């Protein structure tokens, strides 16, 4: 990792540099930060002889792999640090790069947790298609009504029985503006319609899609008076939210969400979902608990 040795800069420049540094570290999950420039006091990447990796405790990798070399590691600059370790392991014919994160829990004693132990993601791996990259546009009304292999509209009783749908909507509202509801609390929004899109086409019964590891959830609701991300004001205004849920093989849950207020169009965007008109709103309006 390059450093800023013997370079003078103002406090404002330093603070900006610190923010940029930690943003880059966060984007790589703390592992691959060689190309991130940082002031000397923030330098956390150390290059060691790969042979020293033989001293790393092999059980952290599981019984089917043997440690080959320690490639690099990064650490947080605390008394009790987190170590972000990249190492090479094999079984023994197939070599695989691993990422391991070890968190110290107490200074001056043996008390640590292995928070991450995973193969490094191959950049050439086949992507998850529609469940990768930016969120899609809102589907067209025609797709919602007729493309049953792709979309499943939940009955009110179905989404009420799964508290994660209302929970995800609450998280989206609060994440959009955390300070807006400090005094008043979360508004009592009313869900009108929920449509789910998954990889499991023709799943029978269709409600099994609720348990899919990868899903887009399209929610129509009212009751949100205003938001910095929304133009129209008023509790009566029908809002649309798109939320992606991905649970990977290691059990990590990733949520990505946004409000949708774009213009209705019949064109498709990035080979994902066609954008379209508003969904009907003639359903009953149960409140979020």
UniProtKB/Swiss-Prot annotation:
InterPro entries reported in the protein's UniProt record: MS5
Short name of one Pfam family: protein_MS5
Annotated segments matching region Disordered: 266-289
Bias-annotated ranges (Polar residues): 268-279
NCBIfam families: A_thl_para_3677
Family per similarity comment: Belongs to the UPF0725 (EMB2204) family.
Protein name per the record: UPF0725 protein At1g27860
Species name: Arabidopsis thaliana (Mouse-ear cress)
């Amino acid at each position: 990792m390059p450093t800023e040795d013997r370079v003078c800069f103002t406090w404002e420049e330093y603070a900006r540099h610190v923010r940029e540094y930690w943003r880059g570290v966060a984007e790589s999950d703390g592992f691959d930060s060689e190309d991130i420039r940082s002031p000397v006091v923030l330098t956390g990447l150390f290059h060691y002889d790969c042979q020293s990796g033989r001293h790393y405790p092999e059980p952290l990798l599981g019984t089917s792999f043997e440690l080959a070399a320690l490639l690099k590691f990064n650490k947080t600059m605390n008394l009790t640090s987190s170590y972000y370790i990249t190492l090479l392991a094999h079984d023994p014919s197939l070599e695989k790069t691993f990422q391991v994160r070890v968190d110290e829990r107490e200074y001056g004693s043996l008390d640590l947790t292995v928070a991450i132990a995973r193969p490094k993601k191959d950049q050439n791996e086949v992507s998850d298609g529609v469940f990768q990259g930016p969120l899609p546009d809102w589907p067209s009304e025609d797709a919602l009504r007729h493309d049953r292999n792709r979309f499943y509209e939940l009955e009110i009783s179905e989404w009420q029985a799964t508290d994660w749908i209302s929970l995800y909507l609450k998280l989206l509202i609060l994440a959009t503006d955390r300070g807006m509801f400090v005094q008043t609390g979360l508004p009592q929004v009313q869900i009108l319609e929920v449509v789910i899109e998954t990889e499991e086409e023709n799943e029978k019964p269709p409600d099994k899609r609720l348990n899919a590891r990868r899903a887009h959830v399209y929610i129509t609701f009212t009751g949100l008076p205003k938001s910095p991300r929304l133009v129209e004001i008023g509790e009566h205004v029908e809002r649309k939210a798109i939320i992606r849920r991905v649970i990977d093989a290691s059990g990590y849950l990733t949520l990505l969400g946004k409000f949708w207020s774009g213009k209705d169009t019949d064109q498709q965007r990035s080979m994902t979902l066609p954008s379209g008109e508003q969904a009907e709103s003639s359903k009953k309006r149960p409140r979020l608990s």
